[in-house]
């Protein structure tokens, strides 16, 4: 459970802040949280670069698993995809996630690719819209939209802003 870690992290903060944060966590309705990091790792002193390296490794792994599973369900091969859209706003990757997927899954080298990044919560919907527009213009083509978000990778221990928490 994350609550003991949150309480420990908030030591020294004013009571109003503590109540607000605990209300946010307890009132979220989330019964189980999934993360690319153990809770101890989230609340450890580590740099953004260290957490981003974890993000790169884990996001790539999750994206590959997700895309493979979706393609299998659709009876498609990675080489059947004409346009790949990857969506993620919680880490920084160069090359971007789509490049890793293209190489790791041996997708077409001439595949059209679009990494959707730094758009916040609207990114997933934007990725779907971009895919729909591509299919409208190219009705016999196939699109894969892969979204990976891992907000625990962006949590910074010394930052008590609501942006860091939410």
Protein language model features and the residues they cover:
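Acyl-thioester C-C bond-transforming condensing/cleaving domain
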Residues: 57, 64-79, 90-166
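Conserved active-site "lid/cap" helical segment
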Residues: 1-82
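Residue-level detector of alpha-helix boundaries and kinks
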Residues: 9, 48, 52, 86, ...
């Amino acid at each position: 459970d994350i609550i003991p870690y949150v309480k420990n992290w908030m030591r020294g903060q004013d009571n109003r802040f503590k109540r607000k944060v605990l209300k946010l966590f307890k009132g979220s309705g989330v019964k189980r949280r999934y993360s690319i990091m153990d809770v101890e790792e989230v609340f450890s002193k580590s740099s953004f670069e260290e957490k981003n390296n974890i993000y790169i490794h884990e996001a790539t792994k999750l994206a590959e698993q997700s895309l493979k599973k979706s393609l299998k369900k659709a009876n498609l091969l990675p080489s059947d995809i004409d346009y790949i859209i990857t969506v993620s706003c919680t880490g920084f990757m160069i090359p971007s996630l789509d490049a890793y997927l293209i190489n790791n899954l041996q997708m077409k080298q001439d595949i059209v690719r679009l990494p959707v990044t730094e758009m916040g919560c609207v990114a997933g919907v934007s990725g779907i819209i971009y895919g729909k527009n591509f299919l409208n213009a190219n009705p016999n083509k196939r699109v894969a939209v892969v979204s990976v978000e891992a907000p625990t990778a962006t949590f910074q221990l010394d930052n008590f802003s609501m942006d860091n928490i939410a």
